[in-house]
Design a protein with these regions (language model features):
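A membrane-topology feature that recognizes alpha-helical transmembrane segments
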Residues: 1-211
Length: 211
């Protein structure tokens, strides 16, 4: 089913570029970015969204149809967060809330479709506990976790579970080191400069789900 993966990747790439363009048009007056840099952002956005669709297509090919739809929904939101964070160094609270609520509703729909109401209630209780815990950490340690970071981490938890989230954090940290250290050494970014975190969470999640 190479055609399915190829089609998914192409559709995702185009969707990512279009989404990047929409976000850029919304923020163009607030940020000054060279045409060369914005073209690079278009490419990165297309790759992020293309990989999201490709990963879901890979899971669909393995026969996990319903899980693939849930995975695709979560990865689309994560890729959208990454694209906006790259362009604006922030993710809209509205987009974060839509992502979290949408994924919760989608997961509950899957449980109801399978008639697993007990699992659904357990899932809601555990998810609520994790969300509150992340929000408390963000309040107590604002330098450790930003206001929107806990929403993104919660979305990662919904996609990957608790153990998977640990692995995603490790993979994200590794990706951050591999990308940021060369940029620091070449002085393309300065020490202490704010960097977007959502792209690294997206990379870590894609790596975990693909494996």
């Amino acid at each position: 089913m190479i055609i399915l993966k190829l089609a998914g990747g192409i559709i995702g790439f185009v969707f990512g570029v279009v989404l990047c363009n929409l976000i850029w048009e919304d923020t163009e007056s607030e940020h000054s970015i060279s045409s060369k840099k914005i073209n690079l952002y278009y490419l990165i956005s297309g790759i992020f969204m293309g990989c999201a669709f490709l990963c879901a297509s890979h899971n669909f090919e393995a026969g996990h149809c319903i899980d693939s739809m849930f995975m695709l929904g979560g990865l689309i939101f994560l890729a959208a967060f990454a694209i906006q964070d790259i362009l604006q160094l922030a993710v809209y609270a509205f987009l974060l809330n839509v992502g979290v609520i949408g994924m919760l509703l989608l997961r509950c729909t899957v449980f109801m479709f399978d008639g697993e109401f007990t699992k659904m209630f357990s899932f809601l209780i555990i998810s609520g506990t994790v969300y509150v815990g992340l929000k408390i950490i963000a309040k107590v340690f604002p330098k450790f976790m930003g206001a929107g970071d806990y929403d993104i981490l919660f979305l990662v938890f919904l996609l990957c579970g608790i153990e998977g989230t640990y692995q995603v954090l490790f993979a994200s940290s590794l990706a951050g080191l591999l990308i940021c250290i060369p940029l620091l050494l070449s002085k393309r970014i300065q020490k202490g400069e704010k960097i977007p975190l959502a792209p690294f969470f997206c990379l870590g999640t894609l790596a975990y789900l693909w494996m």
